[in-house]
């Protein structure tokens, strides 16, 4: 049931289940375009305002706006009902996750794989990893929560609060970690990208919800209106990835092994963060239907935002952009494994 007690039977859909395959297809299509028709990504790359690619901005709004529609910020009123689970989520997402991502990615990219990745490339890949680690997941959390039989009302609160919290610490955390990595980031561009790709879609989603619910009712909004946008996020993401891979053709063809190497620290990070939040929930006596979503929301990433910001900061041709797309490539299969782990350990938690 949802936060109002209505039953929902939403699981992972066709696009979500095979997202890794779609990303591979996007990679192939993008590389073919970049190799045979390089004028296309070059022309699209020139359509920009203040360093922001107009085609990419449109695609990212198509990705993020439907996600914001699904979040009911009225649920924040329920924060005080069971705050321990929320504190676990917040601490994991904002005080642990960004810094473990930085540490793990640095270890692998600069030490373990130093014989395979040049330092200047490793720095760019690290920047992409940092952007992935600094933003907890939004839309896909509802899928993971459903697959682990999580408490839907509590999951909504977890997502809603994180979507609001992201407005404050995301910019300084990214600025700090990229600064430590010796990556120069214009503070204004970083702040503007959050306004453009988080605040505007968030406000648009909230206003749309208010208007539609007022005129058509909550039932129509949740059962009909929202589902009109079901595939918009996926289509927007896949088209964005095609453009990125088209711009990354030479890097991919000259360093195909790098995609595998980048995937290693991202996978380690995902598993580690899941178990940190999951174990903390166990220690503090949370029920499984709160513990599982708590682990999932930290383990998965708001990769749509990461892709948006990395393009705004470094462009589609940067190696940092390639690192964020590898995050998209690896997330679904890893998260499906963690879903199985969560479901098989349900007996560890109180009912």
Residues covered by each model-derived region:
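Alpha-helical transmembrane segments of multi-pass small-molecule/ion transporters
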Residues: 1-69, 74-299, 303-351
């Amino acid at each position: 049931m949802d936060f109002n007690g209505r039953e929902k039977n939403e699981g992972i859909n066709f696009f979500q289940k095979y997202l890794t395959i779609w990303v591979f297809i996007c990679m192939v299509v993008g590389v073919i375009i970049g190799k045979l028709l390089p004028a296309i990504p070059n022309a699209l790359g020139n359509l920009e305002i203040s360093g922001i690619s107009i085609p990419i901005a449109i695609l990212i709004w198509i990705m993020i706006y439907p996600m914001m529609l699904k979040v009911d910020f009225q649920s924040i009123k329920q924060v005080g009902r069971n705050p321990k689970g929320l504190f676990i989520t917040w601490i994991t997402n904002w005080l642990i996750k960004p810094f473990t991502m930085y540490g793990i990615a640095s270890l692998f990219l600069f030490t373990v794989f130093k014989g395979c990745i040049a330092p200047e490339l490793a720095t760019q890949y690290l920047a992409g990893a940092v952007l992935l680690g600094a933003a907890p997941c939004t839309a896909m959390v509802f899928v993971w929560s459903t697959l682990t039989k999580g408490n839907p009302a509590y999951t909504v609160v977890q997502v809603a609060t994180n979507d609001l919290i992201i407005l404050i610490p995301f910019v300084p955390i990214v600025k700090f970690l990229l600064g430590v990595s010796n990556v120069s980031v214009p503070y204004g561009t970083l702040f503007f990208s959050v306004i453009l790709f988080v605040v505007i879609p968030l406000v648009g989603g909230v206003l749309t919800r208010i208007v539609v619910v007022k005129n058509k009712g909550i039932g129509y909004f949740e059962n009909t209106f929202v589902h009109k946008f079901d595939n918009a996020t996926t289509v927007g993401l896949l088209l964005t990835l095609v453009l990125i891979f088209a711009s990354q053709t030479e890097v991919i063809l000259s360093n195909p092994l790098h995609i595998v190497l980048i995937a290693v620290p991202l996978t380690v990070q995902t598993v580690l963060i899941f178990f940190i939040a999951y174990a903390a929930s166990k220690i503090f006596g949370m029920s499984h239907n709160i513990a599982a979503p708590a682990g999932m929301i930290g383990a998965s990433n708001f990769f749509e935002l990461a892709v948006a910001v990395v393009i705004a900061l470094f462009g589609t041709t940067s190696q940092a952009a390639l690192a964020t797309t590898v995050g998209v490539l690896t997330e679904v299969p890893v998260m499906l494994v963690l879903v199985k782990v969560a479901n098989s350990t349900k007996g560890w938690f109180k009912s």
